[in-house]
């Protein structure tokens, strides 16, 4: 399964925030510079992550963005469920005449559930803690 760029950059933004020293805020501009993604795209991503509680946005002079909860409580499977449209096929009888007898949708659904179940085994902390090579690449040492 290939994730959309929206989900990919959402995960990357969370990884960046989780790599920062505890409590340090960052900005959307800083995250976009690190990953080379458009600011408008990142604003949409951060807004959705914020609505889901994964990110906290603070307005004002000393504002910015940071994780909305501890990295060890943010399950990667939950983030993907929030950001990723998980419908793999468009099963509608008006588009496909085999829909009433087709078993493909069920098979793909089981595959997606297995994929998400595996991602549920990882937290954001699992991806960033004690990862010195990551810190060097993100320049957050």
Swiss-Prot record:
Its cofactor is [2Fe-2S] cluster. Residues 28-51 bind DNA. The keyword Glycoprotein does not apply. Residues 2-129 form the HTH rrf2-type domain. InterPro entries: Tscrpt_reg_Rrf2, Tscrpt_rep_HTH_NsrR, WH-like_DNA-bd_sf, WH_DNA-bd_sf. Keywords: 2Fe-2S, DNA-binding, Iron, Iron-sulfur, Metal-binding, Repressor, Transcription, Transcription regulation. It holds the Pfam family Rrf2. GO terms for cellular component: cytosol. [2Fe-2S] cluster binds at residues 91, 96, 102. The keyword Metal-binding applies. Binds 1 [2Fe-2S] cluster per subunit. GO terms for molecular function: 2 iron, 2 sulfur cluster binding; DNA-binding transcription factor activity; double-stranded DNA binding; iron ion binding. PROSITE patterns: HTH_RRF2_2. GO terms for biological process: negative regulation of DNA-templated transcription; regulation of DNA-templated transcription. HAMAP family: HTH_type_NsrR. Nitric oxide-sensitive repressor of genes involved in protecting the cell against nitrosative stress. May require iron for activity. Represses hmp expression under conditions of elevated intracellular iron concentrations, in the absence of nitric oxide. This is HTH-type transcriptional repressor NsrR. It comes from Salmonella typhimurium (strain LT2 / SGSC1412 / ATCC 700720).
């Amino acid at each position: 399964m290939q994730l959309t760029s929206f989900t990919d950059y959402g995960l990357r933004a969370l990884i960046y925030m989780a790599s920062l020293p505890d409590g340090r805020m960052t900005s959307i501009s800083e995250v976009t510079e690190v990953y080379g993604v458009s600011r408008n795209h990142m604003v949409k991503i951060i807004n959705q992550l914020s609505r889901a509680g994964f990110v906290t946005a603070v307005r004002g002079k000393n504002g910015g963005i940071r994780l909305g909860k501890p990295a060890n409580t943010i399950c990667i499977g939950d983030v993907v469920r929030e950001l990723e449209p998980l419908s793999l096929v468009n099963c509608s009888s008006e588009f496909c005449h085999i829909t009433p007898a087709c078993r493909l949708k069920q098979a793909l659904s089981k595959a997606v559930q297995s994929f998400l179940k595996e991602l549920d085994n990882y937290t954001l902390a699992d991806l960033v803690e004690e990862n010195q090579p990551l810190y060097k690449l993100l320049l957050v040492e």
